């Protein structure tokens, strides 16, 4: 047992040195450093679902907010760098409902203008506590295109088709014509070199051609050469 105590001493010293030279000590976090909705107030328990939603244009989306407090709850929407705006119910499109501790926001026939971050805010009994859900839900509307965007896309498609056609002509048709021209050139060169190397001075004239002299016939007329 003594050996175990002695062997553990260097480890303790090493740990102490690491803690000493690792950096300045960080003070403990106090309750004042926590966000307002995490300080244990009655409004601290707020959950929102889902965290992200991507929907097609003209479809429907629902956001749910759960709370353990009975105070009034309001929905807000934040677009980009703008300030959050309170949502106002629209008959047949934006509907806010409550079922016990569950608050539901329903948006029908969503459009591109509905993009943004949605979150709920609850007013507690205490006058100094207004808690906003820190996470919220981001809505992304898909499939929205204006007339100008469609025109630009069609122009881009036409340009891509034209470029592809030019590339096909450049890399397929042009090499074929080059190969055909090369074959025609080879055939012409072979025809041109038919009499190449023939020297006219070395050719024989008609006077140099030896006349054919036939020898005397050994057989008589009417006698077959194969007969003795």
UniProtKB/Swiss-Prot annotation:
InterPro entries, sorted: Ig-like_dom, Ig-like_dom_sf, Ig-like_fold, Ig_sub, Ig_V-set, Phos_immunorcpt_sig_ITAM
Protein origin, superkingdom: Eukaryota
One Gene Ontology biological process: B cell receptor signaling pathway
Expression sites by tissue: B-cells.
UniProt-listed Pfam families: ITAM, V-set
Record topological domains on the Extracellular side: 26-158
Phosphotyrosine PTM positions: 195, 206
Maturation and modification: Phosphorylated on tyrosine upon B-cell activation by SRC-type Tyr-kinases such as BLK, LYN and SYK.
Disulphide bond pairs: 43-124, 65-120
Glycosites: 68, 99, 130
Annotated keywords: Adaptive immunity, Cell membrane, Disulfide bond, Glycoprotein, Immunity, Immunoglobulin domain, Membrane, Phosphoprotein, Receptor, Signal, Transmembrane, Transmembrane helix
Record-linked Gene3D superfamilies: Immunoglobulins
Residues covered by the Ig-like V-type domain: 41-132
GO cellular component: B cell receptor complex; external side of plasma membrane; IgM B cell receptor complex; plasma membrane
Intracellular or extracellular location(s): Cell membrane
Transmembrane portions of the chain: 159-180
Segments in the Cytoplasmic topological domain: 181-228
Oligomer and partners: Heterodimer of alpha and beta chains; disulfide-linked. Part of the B-cell antigen receptor complex where the alpha/beta chain heterodimer is non-covalently associated with an antigen-specific membrane-bound surface immunoglobulin of two heavy chains and two light chains. Interacts with LYN.
Task performed by this protein: Required in cooperation with CD79A for initiation of the signal transduction cascade activated by the B-cell antigen receptor complex (BCR) which leads to internalization of the complex, trafficking to late endosomes and antigen presentation. Enhances phosphorylation of CD79A, possibly by recruiting kinases which phosphorylate CD79A or by recruiting proteins which bind to CD79A and protect it from dephosphorylation.
Record text about domains: The transmembrane helices of CD79A and CD79B chains and two IgM heavy chains assembly in a four-helix bundle structure that appears to be conserved among different BCR isotypes.
Protein name: B-cell antigen receptor complex-associated protein beta chain
Annotated source species: Mus musculus
């Amino acid at each position: 047992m003594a050996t175990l105590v002695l062997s553990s001493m260097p480890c303790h010293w090493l740990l102490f040195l690491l803690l000493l030279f690792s950096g300045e000590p960080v003070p403990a976090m106090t309750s004042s450093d926590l966000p307002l909705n995490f300080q244990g107030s009655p409004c601290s328990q707020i959950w929102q679902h889902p965290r992200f939603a991507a929907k097609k244009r003209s479809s429907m989306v629902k956001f749910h907010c759960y709370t353990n407090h009975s105070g009034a709850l309001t929905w807000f929407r934040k677009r980009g760098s703008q300030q959050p705006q309170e949502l106002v119910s629209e008959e047949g499109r934006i509907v806010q409902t409550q079922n016990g501790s569950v608050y539901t926001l329903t948006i029908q026939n969503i459009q591109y203008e509905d993009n943004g971050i949605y979150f709920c805010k609850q007013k507690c009994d205490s006058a100094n506590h207004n808690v906003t859900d820190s996470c919220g839900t981001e809505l992304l509307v898909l499939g929205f295109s204006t007339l100008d965007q469609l025109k630009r896309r069609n122009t881009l498609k036409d340009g891509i088709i034209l470029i592809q056609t030019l590339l096909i002509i450049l890399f397929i048709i042009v090499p074929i014509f080059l190969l055909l021209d090369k074959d025609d050139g080879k055939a012409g060169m072979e025809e041109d070199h038919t009499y190449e190397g023939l020297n006219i001075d070395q050719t024989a004239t008609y006077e140099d051609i030896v006349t054919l002299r036939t020898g005397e016939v050994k057989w008589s007329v009417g006698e077959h050469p194969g007969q003795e």
